[in-house]
């Protein structure tokens, strides 16, 4: 995961260093906070369904840095990016690590998961955005100093618009290539992202070879690597090690078995797992659930003493789909509860207590609203 994060950050930094994101920011003309927040949330939600929420968060943070100069405004927008990224990843089999796990192991399928989870996921992102918009007024504060720095960048002046656009397109395609690479080769995602870095590196070297640019101005990969945020990487490593310690000690698996024995209801178990995923990583929680419950077959359901309950554990059953939703969306309730939250916290230095006081209730409202929508869907349809 850490190597994947490094690869994603290098890719995004390469695009940004060569002015690729300027094409997007130049087309975002609105200065009103409410409209901009809604636009950022929509882009993040659907981008996260194709990319993973970690990469999406990095890309969107780089975008809002070019649009917002006030760090408190960026904290609000960054928090909504976390919520939208987690919600967007929940309804797509390739949108989050947990949905990929469930999809690859045969617990869920694309044809059933998307239509069942897209509406709850939209609601889980829409409610926090609507609440947040009520507290936003006026226009955004543009980042004057940052814009001037870009204007003074000699490299960007020497690159043509089509060359900047080509770097953006190649970079985005490299990011989109990762889930395809994993599905086709069954190799870890970090190998796909490193291959994408290699492709982008090769293209920029070819670009420099054709243009008369001073060596000092060239932003080769070796220079860009030094620009990525090392503190974010170390912070992310610390979170991963802490969660892995809980997993290795058996605390998470023991709690999963206790949940099964004590609660029993598939909706309640998943809601609790979702709440827990805001404290610890959702990957070991989902892995524990997969280990506890095998995918039920028609024969197993027919032979069961309670066939209606066991049917929830068939492929695309209620338990697995609701698990994908809860584990994905529940991580938004605390900023340390998801990979997207951890990386945004590191990049923007968002205060944990600030997020808890200002955003956690919004995320909880969205989480419960989406859960209610999913439960009602199953009761009505």
Give a label for each model feature.
Residues 70-71, 75, 79, 91-92, ...:
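Juxtamembrane and boundary regions of transmembrane helices in multi-pass small-molecule transporters
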Residues 2, 37-42, 78-79, 114-118, ...:
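Hydrophobic alpha-helical transmembrane segments
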Residues 99-110, 173-187, 378-381:
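Transmembrane helix-loop junctions at the membrane interface of multipass transporters and ion channels
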Residues 1-9, 112-128, 184-197, 269, ...:
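Alpha-helical transmembrane segments
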Residues 47-84, 88, 97, 101-117, ...:
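Membrane-interfacial helix-loop connectors
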Residues 18, 40, 174, 178-315:
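Transmembrane helical segments that form the transport core of multi-pass membrane transport proteins
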Residues 136-170, 201-230:
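Intrinsically disordered, low-complexity non-transmembrane regions of multi-pass membrane transporters
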Residues 6-13, 44-45, 85, 121-133, ...:
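Hydrophobic core segments of alpha-helical transmembrane domains in multi-pass membrane transport
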